[in-house]
Amino acid sequence: MQFIDQAEIQVEAGKGGDGMVAFRREKFVPAGGPAGGNGGRGGSVVLVAVANLQTLLDFKFQRVFKAENGKRGGPKNMTGAGGSDRLIEVPPGTMIYDRETEELLGDLVKPGQTCCVAQGGKGGLGNKHFLSNSNRAPEYALPGLDGEVRMLRLELKLLAEVGIIGLPNAGKSTLIAALSAARPKIADYPFTTLVPNLGVVRKPTGDGTVFADIPGLIEGASAGLGLGHEFLRHIERTRLLLHLVDITDVDPVENFETIQNELEVYGRSLEDKRQVLALNKVDAVDVKGAEIQELVNRFREISGGKVFLISAVAGIGLEELMQEIWGLLEMEEEVKSSELTPTPPLVSREES
């Protein structure tokens, strides 16, 4: 399936139904008063987040969405039927912007959340509303109002708990394939991954955590070079970053610092996210050699934390790495829970 994370669409709410001109005509009331009903309200356009969607691909083929118009008012003061709303399904994580004003209209994070993006027009008033002392038989009614028309920009940010970042060819796709049932395209050359890949990694308890293989970032990504902005955007919602560095590269330390700099320059608190550092492809080097040991110590000094030596291909060190990630996620969950739990009020002995 092709991954599309941005789209532009036009939404048109329904027009309100026209009010009706009608008069009461019954057997013993040959000249009754006005009885024209109001027009029905036009349908609105509503976006709804649906769990089984992961891309905005559908909007590549359909870009205009219209709600139903309201029906005309009827005789005997009957209000016309309202137009049906138009529901547009989007994946969770979709942000909705007005294309002209760039106003954020909605951020649909959870399945079932909705956002009304275009209100249907009000129905026109029937002639019963224009009865007055000077006009006992008004022969006019109001037309329904037009519904809202908007151009929208949809932007999808992946809802992954762990984002795997690193330069191209660091082994991110291989790692997510080793940890989950995801099968991303893998090859031994840079930029194999051109779109984010999602994989669900299972804990020993059976619970799943969504990992996102973010396509390889390059120097200048924060300024939009390559597909930098598109890729960095997907990191914003993650709870934890797994920074993967190719230990066999010419200068792994420089590669690490390049990515850290891009996160800092891009801003939006990306540089403050908790990170786990893993040096990949250790099956291709002598991990006990002095050169590698010196490199690992250097990384410990720079990152100020643990450094994991892994091989996504050979499965080396993956269990220890995952234990660290599970522990950090659980710790964060506990902190969040404690912040949400209200502190019970103190009761003095006199009050008790």
Curated annotation (Swiss-Prot):
Entry binding sites for GTP: 166-173, 191-195, 213-216, 280-283, 311-313
An example Gene Ontology CC term for this record: cytoplasm
Principal subcellular localization: cytoplasm
UniProt keyword annotations, A-Z: Cytoplasm, GTP-binding, Hydrolase, Magnesium, Metal-binding, Nucleotide-binding
Record flagged with keyword S-adenosyl-L-methionine: no
Residue stretches spanning the membrane: none
MF GO annotations: GTP binding; GTPase activity; magnesium ion binding
Compartment list: Cytoplasm
Enzyme Commission number(s) from the entry: 3.6.5.-
Domain OBG-type G: 160-330
Binding site for Mg(2+): 173, 193
Alphabetized InterPro entries for the sequence: G_OBG (IPR031167), GTP-bd (IPR006073), GTP-bd_Obg/CgtA (IPR014100), GTP1-OBG_CS (IPR006074), GTP1_OBG_dom (IPR006169), GTP1_OBG_dom_sf (IPR036726), OBG_GTPase (IPR045086), P-loop_NTPase (IPR027417)
GO biological process: ribosome biogenesis
Function of the molecule: An essential GTPase which binds GTP, GDP and possibly (p)ppGpp with moderate affinity, with high nucleotide exchange rates and a fairly low GTP hydrolysis rate. Plays a role in control of the cell cycle, stress response, ribosome biogenesis and in those bacteria that undergo differentiation, in morphogenesis control.
Similarity field: Belongs to the TRAFAC class OBG-HflX-like GTPase superfamily. OBG GTPase family.
Quaternary context: Monomer.
Protein name as annotated: GTPase Obg
Lineage summary: Bacteria, Bacillati, Cyanobacteriota, Cyanophyceae, Oscillatoriophycideae
UniProt gene name: obg
